[in-house]
Amino acid sequence: MALYRVFAIDILNKRKDLGCATQLIGVLGKVIYLKFVIAPDSFKGSLTAKEVSIAIKKGITKIYPKADVELVPMADGGEGTVQALTDATKGKFITEMVTDPLGKPVEASYGILGDGHTAVIEMSAASGLQLVDENSRDPMKATTFGTGELILSALDQGVTKIILGIGGSATNDGGAGMAQALGAKLLDPKGNELPLGGGFLDRLDRIDVRGVDPRVKKTKILIASDVTNPLTGKNGASVIFGPQKGATVEMVEQLDQNLKHYTDIIEKDLNLAVKEIPGAGAAGGLGAGLIAFTNSQMKHGIDIVVEYSLLKKRAQGADFVFTGEGGIDHQTKFGKTPYGVAQATKLVAPTAPVIALAGNIGKNIESLYQSDAIDVIFSTPSGAKPLDKAIKDSPQDIELVAENVARLVKTTLAAKE
């Protein structure tokens, strides 16, 4: 009923001036102007945000072949953020050979946005858990050095701002490796530089930042993260995230103590208290390292992507908004793409229904409807099937759901004539 209400009332009664450039001939011969904005996240393990967008567009244009369709592939600051923002702004991709979490060379890519002075980096490209075989994971030795190398590469491109997504790390070094790559010296009592990795931070005696690249402090870094954990303690980086990175119970205890010592030295030598800052524990403490060694600010990932993709501008005049991701549940309200897209587009196109597609719909989604953001959620799989088959069929299934929604739009509009 809600879907019929928003389609019929909002579009036909409230939208007297649809104002879109594409003319569509309705089922009764009346000229109708419709604009569809398509802004999904990726379906992880299946399709990128761009591929999901294309599948939705195919379904819509089967019914409305001349529709004004605006594709805005999205992300929430994690996986896919570089692709989404670089594509959205017609930027370019840069690939560098950097240091992976365990010190081996690895190719990592980042984006330069269309403005030419903003870079977008995912720390996981250089320091991510996916780069380390499950049997080789070692948060005692894992380093964010490669992330620092990507930052330096971006500075060499002449950027003045960096968007840095910090999800999916293999590390627990408090951003120490990143700082070392940028030129900081982490010294033991004998004046020797520490080896890379969070397991050696207990040896830290002093920090010398005189060698840090001077461009670092002149460059604004936006940290895209929704993690609010402090650096240490029962809710800190080591305790909450260490085990998934391979930390044993003993390692967790040592890593947590090492990070506490690390922050004590930061406070002594840099005059900064970072231990309890919300988000300092993100990405194995990289949040703390960025705050300590760079000119940085934390911001919700989806808010950054909404801003830099120009979603609000591109959604002006929208009649329908499609979003989605692989799974939607009650936690989607907390920084996930579908909810962020819905909130943003409602500000500029308040009568446009927001239609979310998901590979899996979880429990307790009623709160998403009650929030006056997402209007309706559809599951995309066409019947029960094995996971590998569901993944393979994702493009066709998404296209079919989008086509059926477009048919419903057309039927509802015809009924109001």
Each language-model region and where it sits:
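Cationic, low-complexity basic patches in intrinsically disordered or flexible, solvent-exposed regions
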Residues: 24
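Intrinsic-disorder-associated, low-complexity terminal segments enriched in Asp/Asn/His/Tyr and depleted
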Residues: 4, 10-13, 17
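N-terminal loops that bind phosphate or other acidic moieties
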Residues: 33-166, 170-417
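Phospho-regulatory, low-complexity terminal regions
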Residues: 7, 32-33
